[in-house]
From Swiss-Prot:
Molecular-function annotations in GO: feruloyl esterase activity
InterPro entries recorded: AB_hydrolase_fold (IPR029058), AB_hydrolase_lip/est (IPR051299), Fungal_lipase-type (IPR002921)
Catalytic activity of the protein: feruloyl-polysaccharide + H2O = ferulate + polysaccharide
Name of the gene this protein is made from: faeA
Name of the molecule in the record: Feruloyl esterase A
Sites where the protein binds substrate: 98, 101, 267
Glycosylation site positions: 100
Paired cysteines (S-S): 50-278, 112-115, 247-254
GO cellular component, one term: extracellular region
Protein family: Belongs to the AB hydrolase superfamily. FaeA family.
Functional summary from the UniProt entry: Involved in degradation of plant cell walls. Hydrolyzes the feruloyl-arabinose ester bond in arabinoxylans, and the feruloyl-galactose ester bond in pectin.
Location(s) in or outside the cell: Secreted
EC number, as in UniProt: 3.1.1.73
Any one biological process term the GO annotation gives: pectin catabolic process
Taxonomic source organism: Aspergillus tubingensis
The organism's taxonomic lineage, starting at the top: Eukaryota, Fungi, Dikarya, Ascomycota, Pezizomycotina
Length: 280
């Protein structure tokens, strides 16, 4: 699988014309460490949360046998946050959800006007919605001054986005971190931009991370009505804070411009961590 180096990435951005002004190279070490931490949790979700940071307390499991959606409620007292994480695709049942591209109204959140989302992931969401909302509320009741964080990779990233959107109707202290997230429709993307102040990297509470030529952020196809939000954090190899690009504006300037298709090496590995391998 072809690797995209920082040198190559700079060439892509410079030759993209209008994309140059909307892309900057390098993020702070603090933000980079935070992205790596959330990627660690998201990748560990494929293997029963192996090797997660020692400060994190593993709480209740989220699970539905019909959709095989898996997730956990975690807590980190050192950072005073309640973390919800979803596993990505891990079974044939999940694959059936992945391939249901039909745009479906996001009916569980009426405030999201005209929002439509990936049909399979919506089925996954409604199968665990009651569990998620109940478990989060239990934690908030016990720790009312804790912030809420939601994260996931691939299918788990889409579930994380739907969860964060739903919780935004009740709570206002949410941060969302996704890795290799597929698209929803433009109305949903706009809602997320507004709800999470994601029109600018200076204000965003929604960190959509991509890697090299990961093919999953290209799906479902834009010509079928799917879209991403404004801000993207694009990691290229060798991964580092300096080799992370902040991309705004036209979504086809960074990861999506690399022509990746479907599940490839760049999708399964983020910041050197491969889904479920737990070798970090």
């Amino acid at each position: 699988m072809k690797q995209f180096s920082a040198k190559y990435a700079i060439a892509v951005v410079v030759t993209a014309g209008h994309a140059l002004a909307a892309s900057t190279q390098g993020i702070s070490e603090d933000l980079y460490s935070r992205l790596v931490e959330m990627a660690t949790i998201s990748q560990a979700a494929y293997a029963d949360l192996c090797n997660i940071p020692s400060t994190i307390i593993k709480g209740e499991k989220i699970y539905n046998s019909q959709t095989d959606i898996n997730g956990w409620i975690l807590r980190d007292d050192s950072s005073k946050e309640i973390i919800t994480v979803f596993r990505g695709t891990g079974s044939d049942t999940n694959l059936q959800l992945d391939t249901n591209y039909t745009l479906t109204p996001f009916d569980t959140l009426p405030q999201c006007n005209s929002c439509e989302v990936h049909g399979g992931y919506y089925i996954g969401w409604i199968s665990v919605q009651d569990q998620v909302e109940s478990l989060v509320q239990q934690q908030v009741s016990q720790f009312p001054d804790y912030a809420l964080t939601v994260t996931g990779h691939s299918l788990g990233a889409s579930l994380a986005a739907l969860t964060a959107a739903q919780l935004s109707a009740t709570y206002d202290n949410i941060r969302l971190y996704t890795f290799g997230e597929p698209r929803s429709n433009q109305a949903f993307a706009s809602y997320m931009n507004d709800a999470f102040q994601a029109s600018s990297p200076d204000t965003t509470q929604y960190f959509r991370v991509t890697h090299a030529n990961d093919g999953i952020p290209n799906l479902p196809p834009a010509d079928e009505g799917y879209a991403h939000g404004v801000v993207e954090y694009w990691s290229v190899d060798p991964y580092s804070a300096q080799n992370t690009f902040v991309c705004t504006g036209d979504e086809v300037q960074c990861c999506e411009a690399q022509g990746g298709q479907g599940v490839n090496n760049a999708h399964t590995t983020y910041f050197g961590m491969t889904s479920g391998h737990c070798t970090w």
